[in-house]
């Protein structure tokens, strides 16, 4: 994650913190941060039903996609530090917009967020940087996918864009691989499935870092 590099951070002065998002991730962040003696107020935007359950925490019913209203509210609340949780606002460049207004932000800019928001971009990044990764093919039509599927024994099928954690499939056979690929390309995940990544299936334990 990227923190605004134009200013040094004095954590003892991070009294008013804003957390962008409305999920369990944001609640977990608020729960951890409210334990700090330095923090006085945590505003979760827009938050959810549990956002006000922790001390120092308050949910604000505000649409963070309206950046003009968001910035006005952040200034009004004298926010010292902003954490952006969800992938979509990061991919859409919210961190970049806030940094241009000289806010201190924890979260990648839209360029860094591409590692999450576009699987094909991330795979090409790894390939160009000689970072070990499974072989892959990028397709935008079922006609392009068929010869790849027919010549491969075992593939993972992935919608290229953000699909709320539901865009990755591990088919059991070629027919299932073809069906899933066609389903994604036909709009199961909207624009997130305009491109499909067909990836070599690797065997072994899965580890997240």
Regions found by a protein language model. Give the residues of each.
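Glycine/Thr-rich phosphate-binding loops of Rossmann-like dinucleotide-binding domains
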Residues: 92-93, 165-166, 207
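Short acidic-hydrophobic, aromatic-tinged amphipathic segments that line or gate anion-handling sites
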Residues: 58-65, 137-141, 171
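Short beta-strand segments
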Residues: 20-21, 85, 157-160, 199
């Amino acid at each position: 994650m990227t923190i605004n590099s134009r200013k040094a951070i004095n954590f003892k002065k991070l009294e008013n913190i804003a957390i962008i998002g409305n999920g369990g991730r944001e609640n977990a962040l608020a729960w951890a941060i409210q334990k700090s003696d330095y923090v006085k107020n945590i505003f979760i935007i827009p938050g959810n039903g549990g956002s006000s359950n922790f001390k120092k925490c308050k949910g604000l019913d505000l649409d963070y996609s309206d950046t003009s209203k968001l910035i006005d509210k952040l200034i009004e609340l004298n926010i010292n530090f902003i954490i952006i949780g969800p992938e979509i606002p990061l991919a859409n460049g919210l961190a970049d917009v806030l940094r241009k207004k000289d806010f201190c932000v924890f979260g990648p800019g839209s360029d860094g967020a591409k590692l999450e928001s576009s699987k094909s971009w991330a795979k090409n990044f790894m390939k160009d940087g000689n970072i070990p990764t499974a072989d892959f093919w990028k397709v935008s039509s079922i006609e392009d996918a068929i010869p790849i599927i027919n010549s491969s024994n075992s593939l993972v099928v992935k919608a290229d864009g953000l699909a709320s954690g539901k865009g990755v499939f591990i088919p059991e056979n070629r027919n299932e691989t073809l069906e899933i690929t066609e389903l994604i390309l036909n709009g199961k995940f909207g624009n997130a499935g305009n491109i499909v990544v067909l990836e070599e299936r690797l065997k072994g334990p899965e580890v997240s870092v």
